[in-house]
A protein has these predicted regions:
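Extracytoplasmic metal-acquisition and chelation regions
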Residues: 2-353, 358-361, 365-366
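Structural signal for glycine-centered tight turns and loop->strand junctions in beta-sheet-rich domains
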Residues: 368-370
């Protein structure tokens, strides 16, 4: 065969082989692209909520307003795949109701699918979040809480303690049957352990409506967590501090004290400037003396200046309780805090004290502090 013909055939063979390789490679590339598009499509599935916002069925980013809500939420979502929970105000050591949103806070909320708050007007920035991020689903955990304390109720109790007791009792019962406006409610609802359980249930219920595939898991987690919380509530019920009269210098503590049956004189202070006016101090001291009030309660992180001033004038003892507003981010953080409070409240009833005509008299050290 002519050498030129052989050379030509060799060149044609090389060209044909190259073309085949190019075609085969292109098919593999297209196949990979199609497969990738399918996977991306599956990972970006969404579900519509009642308000029209879309939540990913694969990953849900939840942001909580502050620490107590964070602890509730991690318990409700425990073991649910694809759910990420973060706390917006993670560096906050006190109450959220005087909090101002930072740029970093807004960035966190911007990335959220769900924002969970206390409700009852505790978070003053709630409307701002709704306005800026209308597609973020907001869960009001306090939506169906039943044990609320109103400011009006406190005023009536403090002003009329020794007058018209039967009339006040009837009025308080009527107040409970009427709807209380947000501005009148003490919003620190989580400090009543029964309220806390209701908040946990509400979070689970609303998350189940958003993430239907995990609805049963959310409710199961809530039920298991609430069983542990019920044990704390039962311990408080058995403690029975009914009839004990006390002063609370931190309004969030009032929920826990009243849950335990205590008769509380609540003194509301400005969170930015906690100094009490001379008039308030004078009235409080007189009321404490008239009613033999021997217990003053403050938060574990609060300044004790006001408490010591009242204690020095009345001989009352100071007790520090944990408001569960910060902690170690553990699942049982709230339970540990409430058990600690239980031990302290037990001391109110037992520590070097005795009961006389329904009143409690306590001996205390030179610092007037437990």
């Amino acid at each position: 065969m002519d050498k030129n013909i052989i050379k030509l055939l060799t060149i044609l063979l090389i060209i044909i082989t190259t073309i085949c390789l190019i075609i085969f490679s292109g098919n593999k590339t297209n196949e990979s692209k199609i497969k990738g598009n399918i996977e991306n499509s599956e990972n970006s599935k969404t579900t519509n909520t009642d308000d029209g916002s879309k939540i990913s069925e694969k990953n849900i980013n939840i942001v909580t307003s502050f620490y107590p809500i964070y602890v509730m939420t991690i318990n409700v979502t425990n073991g649910v795949y694809g759910v990420n929970v973060s706390n917006m105000s993670e560096n906050l050591k006190g109450c959220i109701h005087d909090y101002t949103l930072s740029t970093d806070d807004l960035k966190k909320v911007e990335k959220a699918d769900v924002f969970i708050e206390t409700g009852e007007n505790l978070e003053p920035f709630s409307n701002k979040i709704k306005s800026i991020y209308p597609n973020v689903k907001i869960i009001d955990s306090g939506k169906n809480v039943s044990n609320l304390i109103s400011e009006e109720e406190n005023e009536n109790k403090n002003e009329n303690k020794n007058e018209n007791k039967n009339e006040n009792k009837d009025k308080n019962e009527n107040d409970k049957s009427e709807e209380t406006s947000e501005s009148e409610v003490n919003p620190h609802i989580w400090m009543n352990t029964k309220n806390y359980c209701e908040q946990v249930t509400e979070i689970a219920k609303q998350l189940g409506e958003i993430d239907i595939n995990n609805k049963e898991k959310y409710m199961e987690n809530a039920e298991n967590y609430n069983k542990k919380l019920d044990e704390i509530s039962n311990k408080f019920s058995e403690l029975n501090l009914s009839g004990v009269r006390a002063v609370s210098l931190d309004e969030q503590l009032e929920y826990l004290l009243r849950q335990n049956g205590m008769d509380v004189i609540s003194i509301e202070t400005d969170h930015e400037n906690s100094a009490l006016s001379a008039d308030v101090v004078s009235k409080t001291i007189n009321e404490m003396k008239e009613n033999n009030v021997k217990a003053i309660f403050i938060d574990k992180d609060s300044d004790d200046k006001n408490a010591k001033m009242l204690a020095n004038e009345t001989g009352a003892r100071i007790y520090r309780l944990n408001s569960a507003m910060n902690g170690d981010n553990s699942y049982d953080s709230y339970i540990k805090d409430m058990n600690q409070n239980y031990e302290i409240l037990k001391q109110v009833k037992e520590y070097n004290g005795r009961w006389v005509d329904g009143q409690m008299w306590i001996t205390f050290n030179e610092n007037n502090e437990f």
